[in-house]
Amino acid sequence: MRILCDTNIILDVLLDRAPFVEASAEVLKRCEIGIIEGFTTTSCITDIFYLVHKQLHDNERSYQAIEQLLTILRVADVTNSHIAEALSHRASDFEDCLAAVCAKSIHCDFVVTRDIKGFVGFDIPILTPSELIERMEL
């Protein structure tokens, strides 16, 4: 199974955001041990660094968070054609639209996010972390 992890899932774990951290951590754990092939986008990486640094006020811990993340998830490149396709959708949430376009281009089965409404209208299934775990346990 191939998934694209949205920014909020990763931040739940890195910033220990209750009550979401448990399910999000389980998704990343399954990626880490190879049960799931997990991806994020290049733009997500820069957003995560910025938001972790803003919260922790610690450059070194922010760099370490990204280094650790890169041992768990693969990074899907954002290309000119992805951006052009996302722009053509005229979606209200461009960031989520771009993530959906990238996920489709690398043949992900799902986008995993807590921001379901940001991904409405795209031709890729969307699951919350809890829904993904539940689906895998059936």
Please name every model-derived segment:
Residues 1-40, 54-61, 121, 130-138:
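Short, well-structured N-terminal submotif of metal-dependent ribonuclease cores
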Residues 12-14, 47-48, 84-86:
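A short acidic, helix-capping loop that chelates divalent metal ions and anchors anionic groups
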Residues 25, 47-74, 79-81:
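Active-site-proximal, substrate-binding regions of enzyme catalytic domains
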Residues 40-44, 82:
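Short, conserved alpha-helical segments within structured domains
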Residues 71-116:
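Active-site neighborhoods of divalent-metal-dependent phosphate/nucleic-acid chemistry enzymes
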Residues 76-78, 126-129:
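Short acidic-hydrophobic, aromatic-tinged amphipathic segments that line or gate anion-handling sites
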Residues 117-124:
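Short loop/helix-cap segments at secondary-structure boundaries that form the rim of catalytic
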